[in-house]
């Protein structure tokens, strides 16, 4: 299995600006250096699919984790935009594969 678990922050912070599209199908990842977006390095591949448990702050200010699905990096869109673009390929994961 070529997968990794990713726990991105989906709220503003000093190191990363990760945004989830309204339909939850795309995560856009930007690194922040000295308060500015840094152009991300080109991706040459192969890349691991990401099992995403994003953390975000709920209405009480608590950090919570939520499963969003399995995402695959869109190398073409990422290299073109200078951001890392991840597209959802599955809303489910079969945990029996990991036992």
Residues covered by each model-derived region:
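Compact mixed alphabeta submodule
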Residues: 61-99
């Amino acid at each position: 299995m070529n997968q990794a678990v990713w726990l991105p922050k989906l709220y503003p912070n000093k190191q990363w600006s990760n945004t989830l599209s309204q339909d939850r199908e795309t995560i856009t990842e930007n690194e922040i250096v000295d308060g500015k977006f840094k152009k991300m390095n080109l991706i040459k591949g192969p890349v691991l699919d990401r099992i995403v448990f994003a953390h975000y702050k709920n209405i009480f200010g608590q950090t919570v984790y939520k499963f969003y699905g399995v995402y695959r990096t869109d190398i073409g869109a990422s290299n073109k935009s200078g951001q890392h673009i991840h597209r959802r390929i599955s809303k489910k994961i079969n945990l029996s594969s990991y036992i």
